[in-house]
């Protein structure tokens, strides 16, 4: 028979050596209570006293998670996906309205031409329309081809009815992040809503693709959106208490059964 290959030899158990302490030194554990020893360094981020504006922003965000949010308001949490939003903003930037400097230059050239006795053909430029009242009028007159709404308008009541109006008039609409980005397109700090009435011939193919995708994401999903409530998410402590209570009730019910 072939010799058996044995494993490693058992390691002898180490003897525990008792630590010799000097009886002259007393053991004084630190008390980290009020007026006691300084606590060890740790992350104190949550105890920072933030500025009032930041505090209100945080409280509003938490409150939106805790309270039940009706579907009309909850729809503003569903925004356009990043890739489609990038293509949309590229399109909107092509139709930016002129700023003050460009307008001044155009009027100066026109005045010079008129002074020389030339006839100037003034073509109406194709630009992005903005302003809530103006956009509403364009939707009601069925002139709007696409409506872009900001998700963070404050107060939200200004635009909460706009998606319903767009659906009624069968105008494609989308909700994007955020009002500052929309404002930068029209040379303003913020803009709650933008609108395109028409595009140039070379952009029509790309624009039709964007419209199709937006319709599929927003106009066609109306039945889902109008039923979906938001919020109602409690904090971690509250969830832990609820779980413990449910566990206790389940245990009592099991005991009654036996």
Swiss-Prot record:
Protein's UniProt keywords contain 4Fe-4S: no
GO biological process, one term: ribosome biogenesis
Gene Ontology, cellular component aspect: ribonucleoprotein complex; ribosome
SUPFAM superfamilies in UniProt: L30e-like
Region of interest called Disordered, as start-end residue ranges on this chain: 1-20
Family affiliation: Belongs to the eukaryotic ribosomal protein eL8 family.
This protein's name: Large ribosomal subunit protein eL8z
């Amino acid at each position: 028979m072939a010799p058996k290959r044995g494993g490693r030899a058992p390691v002898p158990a180490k003897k525990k050596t008792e630590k010799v302490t000097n009886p002259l030194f007393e053991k004084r554990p630190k008390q980290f209570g009020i007026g006691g020893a300084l606590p060890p360094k740790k992350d104190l981020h949550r105890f920072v006293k933030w500025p009032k504006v930041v505090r209100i922003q945080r409280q509003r965000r938490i409150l939106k998670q805790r309270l039940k949010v009706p579907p009309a308001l909850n729809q503003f949490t569903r925004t356009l996906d990043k890739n489609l939003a990038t293509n949309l903003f590229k399109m909107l930037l092509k139709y930016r309205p002129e700023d003050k400097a460009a307008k001044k230059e155009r009027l100066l050239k026109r005045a010079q031409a008129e002074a020389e006795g030339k006839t100037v053909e003034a073509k109406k430029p194709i630009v992005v329309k903005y302003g809530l009242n103006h956009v509403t009028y364009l939707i009601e007159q069925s002139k709007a081809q696409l409506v872009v709404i900001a998700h963070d308008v404050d107060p939200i009541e200004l635009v909460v009815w706009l998606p319903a109006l767009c659906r009624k008039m069968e105008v494609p609409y989308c909700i994007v992040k955020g009002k500052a980005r929309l404002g930068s397109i029209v040379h303003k700090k913020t803009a709650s809503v933008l609108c395109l009435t028409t595009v140039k011939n070379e952009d029509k193919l790309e624009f039709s693709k964007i419209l199709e995708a937006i319709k599929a994401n927003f106009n066609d999903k109306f039945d889902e959106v109008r039923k979906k409530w938001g919020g109602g998410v409690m904090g971690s402590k509250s969830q832990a208490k609820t779980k413990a209570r449910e566990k206790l009730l389940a245990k009592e019910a099991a005991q009654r059964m036996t």
